[in-house]
């Protein structure tokens, strides 16, 4: 699952000061000095992995695809720039959770789901994260679409009321912002990449099989995924 590490700090690593050029620094003095933040982050992560139907489905799908996820190996609670909540580090196959910016369990659940979608894409496809912005755009579209980032409830908390086609608008906007945060490219280039892949990637609902607009939707999707797995196992 690991990729060649980037040689320059051009890929958003400035937002995650504990890693620097794709190298995890889990045991840094900074992490240890902020034990309370780290402990809370680890606890919320465990709850997310154990109880979120979004996360449980993604973990099962990755295991089925040959990419078993281990909490201690593939997740890292770290201090980050104030503008981000998490990230997927393709160079180390790690999900970074920003312990200083995630304070509620519902937020942790969404971040874990969002980043697990990137990890799932990394597992199932030959994603060229560092050189192909269209690949990055596709995964950002899928993550925004399927993670719950753009549910109506979350949009209302952002004071976005009654926008026609709000879900698609939100997905496009969040994908664009995510790309611009981690790539030193123009807005025009990012918009072009999003536009080119939007339809196909927005309609790629794997492994959920649908857009889970709520926790209840995610539970149904998880049940269907388990039943599908049992069906194929009995063939």
From Swiss-Prot:
Q: What is its EC number?
A: 3.4.24.-
Q: Where does a divalent metal cation bind?
A: 114, 118
GO terms assigned for molecular function: metal ion binding; metalloendopeptidase activity
InterPro entries assigned: Peptidase_M76_ATP23
**What Pfam families does this protein's entry cite?**
Peptidase_M76
Metal-binding is among the record's keywords = yes
Cellular component, GO annotation? mitochondrion
Task: Cite the entry's keywords alphabetically.
Answer: Hydrolase, Metal-binding, Metalloprotease, Protease
Which residues catalyse the reaction? 115
An annotated GO BP: mitochondrial proton-transporting ATP synthase complex assembly
PANTHER family tied to this protein: MITOCHONDRIAL INNER MEMBRANE PROTEASE, MITOCHONDRIAL INNER MEMBRANE PROTEASE ATP23 HOMOLOG
Q: Which family does it belong to?
A: Belongs to the peptidase M76 family.
Protein name as catalogued? Mitochondrial inner membrane protease ATP23 homolog
Organism from which the protein derives? Xenopus laevis (African clawed frog)
């Amino acid at each position: 699952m690991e990729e060649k590490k980037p040689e320059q700090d051009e890929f958003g690593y400035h937002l995650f000061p504990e890693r620097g050029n794709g190298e995890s620094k889990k045991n840094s003095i900074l992490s240890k000095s902020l034990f309370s933040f780290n402990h809370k982050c680890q606890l919320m992560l465990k709850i997310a992995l154990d109880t979120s139907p979004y996360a449980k489905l993604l973990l099962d799908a990755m295991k089925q695809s040959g990419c078993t996820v281990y909490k201690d190996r593939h997740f890292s609670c770290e201090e980050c720039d104030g503008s981000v909540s998490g990230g997927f580090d393709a160079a180390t196959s790690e999900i970074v959770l920003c312990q200083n910016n995630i304070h509620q369990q519902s937020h942790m659940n969404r971040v874990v789901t969002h980043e697990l979608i990137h990890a799932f894409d990394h597992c199932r496809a030959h994603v060229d994260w560092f050189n192909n912005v269209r690949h990055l755009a596709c995964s950002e579209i899928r993550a925004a679409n399927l993670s719950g980032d753009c549910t109506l409830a979350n949009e209302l908390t952002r004071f976005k009321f009654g926008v026609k086609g709000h879900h698609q608008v939100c997905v496009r906007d969040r994908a664009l912002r995510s790309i611009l945060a981690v790539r030193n490219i123009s807005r025009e280039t990012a918009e072009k990449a999003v536009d080119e892949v939007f339809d196909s990637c927005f309609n790629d609902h794997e492994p959920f099989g649908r857009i889970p607009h709520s926790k209840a939707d995610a539970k149904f999707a998880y049940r269907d995924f388990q039943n599908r797995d049992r069906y194929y196992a009995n063939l």
